[in-house]
């Protein structure tokens, strides 16, 4: 009898260990590893997005994010965000800007690079992760992970809230949603498509959807997407992607 009870306990403990729920941190770690992992930290990545040409360079803790794009007058500028802040160049000359405009341009440059290199960046110090649960989209199971940001280190958009749907089998981020406060606020839902891997780093494009009902919880946007109740706002396509791994 004792052996029988002991056997049941061992089976129960083994089952409990095998079915132990992963934490949000563990899921994000796996998602980053699947998408490129350590390669992000020492790489040059360039791509074209809409009218701009973008380039990022990371070497350990040092980084530089660039954008070359004409303004409304056709004048071409090079915007740079690095460890020291933001700088705008016209040819090789530094262009003086007000602090408020520097913030606007810096956020714009950073935002494009951020989305292109997702899920890298989700382990930054100011990022808070919470596992909401699991859900199913198009018959595939996903972890739902909510992302918020600390005021300190979270940037000008620290009030934004994100939801990521991470595939429970391959740990790819196939969907994401976010709420934002600028320009009277809004909600967006994105579906990843056209995945490709270049030098071991995974990239995707996005279908970008919206809803005008700003009271909708982020966690319900996937249901609205499946019910075709979201409006396709745009497609976010990154072209001519090149990656150079640095030593």
Predicted regions located by residue number:
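Bacterial Sec-dependent N-terminal signal peptides
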Residues: 1-26
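Short solvent-exposed loop/turn micro-motifs enriched in small/polar/acidic residues
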Residues: 40, 49, 72, 127-128, ...
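Extended beta-sheet lipid-handling architectures
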Residues: 47-51, 81, 190, 206-207
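Gly/Pro-enriched, hydrophobic low-complexity segments
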Residues: 142-241
């Amino acid at each position: 009898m004792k052996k029988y009870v002991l056997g049941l306990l061992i089976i129960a403990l083994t089952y409990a260990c095998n079915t132990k729920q992963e934490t949000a941190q563990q899921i994000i770690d796996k998602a980053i590893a699947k998408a490129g992992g350590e390669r992000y930290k020492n790489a040059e990545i360039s791509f074209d997005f809409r009218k701009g040409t973008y380039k990022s360079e990371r070497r350990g803790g040092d980084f530089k994010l660039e954008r070359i794009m004409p303004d409304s007058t056709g004048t071409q500028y090079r915007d740079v965000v690095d460890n020291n802040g933001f700088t705008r160049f016209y040819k090789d000359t530094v262009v003086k800007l007000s602090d408020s405009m520097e913030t606007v341009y810096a956020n714009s440059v950073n935002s494009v690079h951020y989305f292109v290199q997702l899920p890298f960046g989700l382990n930054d110090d100011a990022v808070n992760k919470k596992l909401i649960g699991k859900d199913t989209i198009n018959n595939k199971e996903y972890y739902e992970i909510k992302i918020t940001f600390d005021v300190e280190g979270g940037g000008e958009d620290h009030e934004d809230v994100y939801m990521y749907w991470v595939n429970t089998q391959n740990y790819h981020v196939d969907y994401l949603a976010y709420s934002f406060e600028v320009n009277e606020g809004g909600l967006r839902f994105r579906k990843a498509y056209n995945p490709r891997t270049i030098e071991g780093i995974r990239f995707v494009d996005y279908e970008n959807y919206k809803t005008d009902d700003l009271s909708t919880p982020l966690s319900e946007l996937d249901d609205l997407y499946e019910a075709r109740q979201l409006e396709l706002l745009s497609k976010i396509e990154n072209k001519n992607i090149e990656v150079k791994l640095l030593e």
